[in-house]
């Protein structure tokens, strides 16, 4: 037990902390605020406090808890909403009303709720860390697998029968090799700064299907991959994150609102329970864990919220699920690091950020991956991390963006100009890239269409050609272009407006399945091939631009039936044949 000697914002310095450990959780002051030791010098400890420190004075006590910042992992995580240190916000509201009183704590998992447990092991079985003891139907979508904690191995000497239990009841007893008995409950605790172990990492070969055409077709992300969405204010970062949280084919979604506006978390809370999962027809909230750490909450908790979120994601990965983690926004976390670092009087790096910013960001993204989990029966699970970055003024040369780009493999650059033109998602196809294309193309070729990569590359080349032509058009006007190049501009406009643009608020267009994406691409590229043929045969470009099929191609994104979209290929061919007859070519 120590005494406070100095308070500067979220940082508290305490004396007399002999025996305290680095990253140990402490209770600060008379109110018992939650804090974490981030520096030790002799018996003096520097503590970052996860709550508002107003009113705390020197001389008040600091009490160590003996444990590091940990999360509870077990049934009850899904559909919950936590703050950055895994306090359940609903529970805190019951205790203190709409505003959180300081020093309040509540167990992260409900202690009184009974879960129906079905054992999958029997007495005498040998178990190791990561084995499944039994299953609990946590929601109608997700079956929660009760895992043996990674540090336990031995022989089952007692296992609970099928029935209803709370998370505090002992459901199994394991005799360890040294003869001691370990009692296992439905949940266990895990320190957030330590990554959960696994057997080995697998290459990311399966794409995370998001239903967003720009992302799936042009800049794919693999399951277990990492992506960054940088963009200036109002360019659609949060809406893109919401779209991915709603429609990506991950089985569990962890959404971290880290230092963003409170009304954005409210949007998620209001929308998700109403939205149905396209695969199961059940509310999306049933597969979601929300971590709300809005911009008016204490700065230090932002760092904790990032680690809390990724630890929960790794836990579901260990059960064999594909998890998508959205962090919105990692810039706010970096700003919190900068503020704490400044108060610690550390040497500032670029733009005032601490020198260790790069390693902190890398450490976070490195916890993503597709892995073979621990346990006697190997399972495959993945954590895909998608982090939004909000550089001030949309400047991509800023340290947070640059350090993020070093470690992520997919870059979706949001563009304020596209957003102003009402082109959403405002992902700039000339600046963005994905390094997973070669890895995921086999999956696309096997499961969707063997010509996927060829079509994608053709479309990309056309869009790049358009950017070159636009320069010329700006100088000399469109009439100076040869017919072939005028025709390219017609097709690329179709690609931009009828393919890349996607309406997040339209019932059909908000989610576009892979088969439909490929069929739409085929329709547009078929139009391109016929257009080039027509121009070479001498058909005027104006005639091609007036073809009635163009309007139908423009509307195909709102058509749920893939066969009707495919029929547009024959219709296009028929209209071109008529043109050829008309001009006798």
From Swiss-Prot:
This protein's name: A-type ATP synthase subunit A
Membrane topology value: Peripheral membrane protein
NCBIfam families: ATP_syn_A_arch, PRK04192.1
SMART domains hit by this protein: AAA
GO cellular component terms attached to this protein's record: plasma membrane; proton-transporting two-sector ATPase complex, catalytic domain
Known function: Component of the A-type ATP synthase that produces ATP from ADP in the presence of a proton gradient across the membrane. The A chain is the catalytic subunit.
Gene responsible for this protein: atpA
Catalysed reaction equations from the record: ATP + H2O + 4 H(+)(in) = ADP + phosphate + 5 H(+)(out)
Stretches assigned to coiled coil: none
Enzyme Commission number, as recorded: 7.1.2.2
CDD domains on file: ATP-synt_V_A-type_alpha_C, ATP-synt_V_A-type_alpha_N, V_A-ATPase_A
Family designation: Belongs to the ATPase alpha/beta chains family.
Compartments, record wording: Cell membrane
UniProt keywords, alphabetically: ATP synthesis, ATP-binding, Cell membrane, Hydrogen ion transport, Ion transport, Membrane, Nucleotide-binding, Translocase, Transport
Record has Cell inner membrane as a keyword: no
Subunit structure, interactors included: Has multiple subunits with at least A(3), B(3), C, D, E, F, H, I and proteolipid K(x).
Keyword Cell wall biogenesis/degradation: no
Organism: Thermococcus gammatolerans (strain DSM 15229 / JCM 11827 / EJ3)
Broad EC category: translocase
GO molecular function terms attached to this record: ATP binding; ATP hydrolysis activity; proton-transporting ATP synthase activity, rotational mechanism; proton-transporting ATPase activity, rotational mechanism
GO annotation terms (biological process): proton motive force-driven plasma membrane ATP synthesis
């Amino acid at each position: 037990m120590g005494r406070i000697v100095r308070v500067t914002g979220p940082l508290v310095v305490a004396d007399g902390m002999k025996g305290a450990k680095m990253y140990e959780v402490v209770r600060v002051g008379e109110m018992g605020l939650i804090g974490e030791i981030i520096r030790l010098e002799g018996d003096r400890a520097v503590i970052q406090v996860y709550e508002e420190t107003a009113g705390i004075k020197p001389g008040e006590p600091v009490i160590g808890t003996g444990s590091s910042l940990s999360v509870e992992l077990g049934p009850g995580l899904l559909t919950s909403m936590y703050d950055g240190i895994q306090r359940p916000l609903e529970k805190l509201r019951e205790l203190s009303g709409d505003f959180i009183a300081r020093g309040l704590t509540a167990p992260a998992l409900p202690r009184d709720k009974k879960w129906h447990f079905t054992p999958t092991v029997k007495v005498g079985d040998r178990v190791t860390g990561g084995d499944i003891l039994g299953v609990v139907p946590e929601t109608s979508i997700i079956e929660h697998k009760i895992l043996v904690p990674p540090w336990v191995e031995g022989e089952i000497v007692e296992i609970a029968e099928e029935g209803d239990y709370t998370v505090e009841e002992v459901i199994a007893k394991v005799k360890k090799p040294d003869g001691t008995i370990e009692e296992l409950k439905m949940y266990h605790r895990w320190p957030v700064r330590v990554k959960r172990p696994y057997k080995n990492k697998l290459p990311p070969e399966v794409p995370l299907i998001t239903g967003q055409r720009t992302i799936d077709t042009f800049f794919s992300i693999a399951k277990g991959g990492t992506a960054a969405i940088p963009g200036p204010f109002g360019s659609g970062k949060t809406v893109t994150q919401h779209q991915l949280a709603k429609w990506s084919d991950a089985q569990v979604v962890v959404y971290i609102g880290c230092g963003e506006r409170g009304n954005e978390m409210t949007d998620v809370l209001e929308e998700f329970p109403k939205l149905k999962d396209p695969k199961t027809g059940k509310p999306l909230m049933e597969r979601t864990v929300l971590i709300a750490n809005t911009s008016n909450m204490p700065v230090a908790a932002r760092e904790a919220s990032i680690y809390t979120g990724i630890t929960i994601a790794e836990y579901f990965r260990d059960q064999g699920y594909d998890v998508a983690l959205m962090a919105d926004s990692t810039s706010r976390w970096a700003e919190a690091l900068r503020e704490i670092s400044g108060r610690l009087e550390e040497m500032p790096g670029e733009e005032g950020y601490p020198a260790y910013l790069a390693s902190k960001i890398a450490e976070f993204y490195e916890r993503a991956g597709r892995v073979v989990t621990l346990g006697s029966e190997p399972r495959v699970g993945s954590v895909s991390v998608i982090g939004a970055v909000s550089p001030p003024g949309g400047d991509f040369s800023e340290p947070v963006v640059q350090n993020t780009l070093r470690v992520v493999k997919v870059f979706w650059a949001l563009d304020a100009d596209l957003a102003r033109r009402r082109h959403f998602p405002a992902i700039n196809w000339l600046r963005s890239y994905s390094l997973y294309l070669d890895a995921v193309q086999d999956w696309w070729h096997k499961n969707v269409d063997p010509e996927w990569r060829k079509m994608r590359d053709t479309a990309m080349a056309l869009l790049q050609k358009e950017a070159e032509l636009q320069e010329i058009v700006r100088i000399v006007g469109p009439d100076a272009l040869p017919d072939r190049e005028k025709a390219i501009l017609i097709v690329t406009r179709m690609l931009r407006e009828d393919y890349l643009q996607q309406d997040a608020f339209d019932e059909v267009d908000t989610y576009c399945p892979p088969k439909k994406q490929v069929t739409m691409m085929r329709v547009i590229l078929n139009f391109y091939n016929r257009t080039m043929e027509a121009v070479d045969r001498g058909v005027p470009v104006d005639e091609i631009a007036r073809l009635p099929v163009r309007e139908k191609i423009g509307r195909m994104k709102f058509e749920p039936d893939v066969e009707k979209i495919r029929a547009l290929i024959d219709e296009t061919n028929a209209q071109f044949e008529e043109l050829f007859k008309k001009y006798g070519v």
